[in-house]
């Protein structure tokens, strides 16, 4: 276990602001609001912020706010928040927006992890060192952004999620105010950081990230983590003690929560993360059915290293049109490969709406590079939204050319091991268990696969339908969710699930 040696810039302001509010009587204290982002990282960190402020300010009535339509940013009109202290987490506030808010008497404490400008984002009437006073009137409003992405911050911690940056802020608060590392050492808190690293697709291969994944994978699954797991389990969940492992997060937990946001059920998502249970309706199934319908109408324009997907409004009801743009990023993700990125965009009678970019290689800053060609991408390096996207042949050609150049510098090879007998391989701990466990700590495009080189006549299909197949190979179960894959053209992915190796025929050899 290791701590952040040098606190992020602005944490001292964070501590002083909370201490200032804490020193006031409740009836004299200015109104406080916690503003979260509409995704798993945003809600988990919003809950953590609420718990922290409720405890420190001895006030269990602090309100929160989350945007509709999975919109990322600060959208509450500033005139409605004059005199407020707004604690924001997991979304960007740029310098111009900060200046506007502060000029209108709104005090802002922002904790973020998205790419940002090179200089510290702050705005206040007084000199920097004077921000440490109790400033509650509109003339003395102030705002600042704590962010691990500033170039002056420790690069070893750039992987952190919004919850991760907040973890350091609150942990440093307790260390300085109470001389305690209990919060920093708390396994559930660290597990929540690990959960958001996975849900937000952060660079989990960075050395400092592993401790948070360890906390998640080895958590006893009690208390709040246990609640999250049990709430999203389906009735047909198979045997074995459920746990928040990589596959569970990727294929059960994240889809369950994200589907609520996509159908504009943010209130249900907030209620779930805040501890009030998951809704009875199966939104994950509704999501799959809606995506399949959308895929029946999309138009793809494919280039060597980039695919453009137009999602038309064809056949959609007015209600469906109100949330279809929330599915753009998901559709883009379904067509990404190790050598291909995707831009998906919505169109309604010639008017273009939300667009999203998705790529699988985090070592390339696609957002920065493609923004140089005229895009207005907002978000992370390889997963972000695009504002005011206007498709054209000229734009497509220029983006394809740049993506081809970017991929030319990437030496990504699929790592796989030839395995002649699955049963012997999986029962050898140094092979089966170790490889399956290590894959839980690797980015998708760095995972280790298996190529079956044994006797194909020993493979028996046990059951399946048009969506999946389950095979027995040397007496070992192998699942497959793409019926175009075979053991001749595909590779097997070993992962740990419920503490034991599981196998899935997961990708084409030449993909």
Language-model segments: what does each one mean?
Residues 509-511:
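Extended, charge-rich, solvent-exposed interface segments
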Residues 471-487:
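Beta-strand/loop nucleic-acid-binding surfaces
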């Amino acid at each position: 276990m290791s701590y952040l040696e040098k606190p992020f810039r602005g944490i001292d302001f964070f501590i002083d602001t909370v201490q200032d509010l804490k020193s006031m009587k409740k009836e004299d204290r200015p109104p406080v609001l916690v503003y979260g982002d509409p995704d798993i990282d945003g809600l988990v960190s919003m809950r953590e912020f609420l718990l922290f402020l409720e405890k420190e300010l001895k006030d269990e009535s602090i309100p929160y706010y989350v945007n509709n339509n999975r919109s990322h940013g600060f959208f509450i009109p500033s005139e409605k928040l004059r005199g407020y202290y707004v604690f924001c987490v997991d979304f960007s506030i740029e310098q111009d927006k900060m200046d506007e808010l502060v000029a209108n008497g709104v005090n802002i404490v922002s904790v973020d992890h998205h790419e940002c400008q090179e200089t510290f984002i702050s705005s206040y009437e007084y000199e920097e060192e004077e921000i440490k006073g109790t400033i509650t009137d509109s003339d003395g409003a102030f705002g600042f952004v704590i962010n691990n992405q500033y170039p002056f911050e420790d690069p070893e911690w750039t992987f952190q999620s919004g919850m991760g940056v907040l973890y350091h802020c609150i942990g440093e608060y307790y260390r300085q105010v109470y001389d305690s590392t209990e919060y920093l050492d708390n396994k559930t808190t660290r597990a929540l950081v690990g959960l958001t690293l996975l849900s937000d697709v952060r660079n989990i291969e960075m050395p400092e990230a592993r401790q948070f994944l360890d906390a998640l994978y080895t958590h006893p699954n009690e208390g709040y983590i246990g609640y999250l797991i049990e709430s999203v389990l389906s009735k047909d969940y198979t045997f074995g003690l459920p746990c928040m492992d990589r596959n569970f997060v990727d294929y059960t937990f994240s889809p369950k929560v994200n589907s609520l946001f996509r159908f504009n059920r943010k209130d249900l998502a907030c209620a779930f993360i805040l501890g009030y249970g998951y809704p009875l309706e199966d939104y994950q199934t509704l999501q799959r059915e809606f995506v399949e319908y959308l895929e029946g109408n999309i138009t793809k324009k494919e280039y060597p290293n980039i695919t453009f997907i137009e999602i038309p409004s064809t056949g959609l009801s007015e209600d469906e049109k109100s949330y279809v743009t929330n599915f753009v990023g998901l559709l883009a993700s379904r067509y990404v490969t190790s050598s291909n990125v995707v831009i998906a965009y919505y169109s309604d009678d010639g008017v273009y709406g939300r667009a999203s970019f998705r790529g699988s290689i985090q070592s390339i800053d696609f957002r920065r590079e493609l923004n140089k060609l005229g895009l207005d991408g907002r978000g992370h390096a390889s997963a972000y939204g695009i504002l005011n996207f206007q498709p054209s042949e000229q734009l497509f050609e220029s983006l394809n050319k740049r993506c081809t150049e970017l991929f030319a510098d990437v030496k990504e090879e699929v790592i796989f091991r030839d395995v002649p007998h699955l049963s012997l391989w999986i029962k050898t701990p140094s092979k089966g268990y170790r490889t399956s466990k290590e894959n839980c700590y690797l980015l998708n495009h760095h995972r280790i696969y298996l190529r079956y080189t044994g006797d194909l006549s020993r493979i028996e299909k046990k059951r399946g339908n048009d969506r999946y197949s389950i095979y027995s190979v040397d007496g070992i179960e192998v699942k497959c969710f793409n019926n175009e894959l075979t053991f001749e053209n595909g590779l097997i992915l070993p992962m740990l699930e419920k503490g034991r190796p599981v196998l899935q025929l997961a990708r084409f050899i030449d993909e």
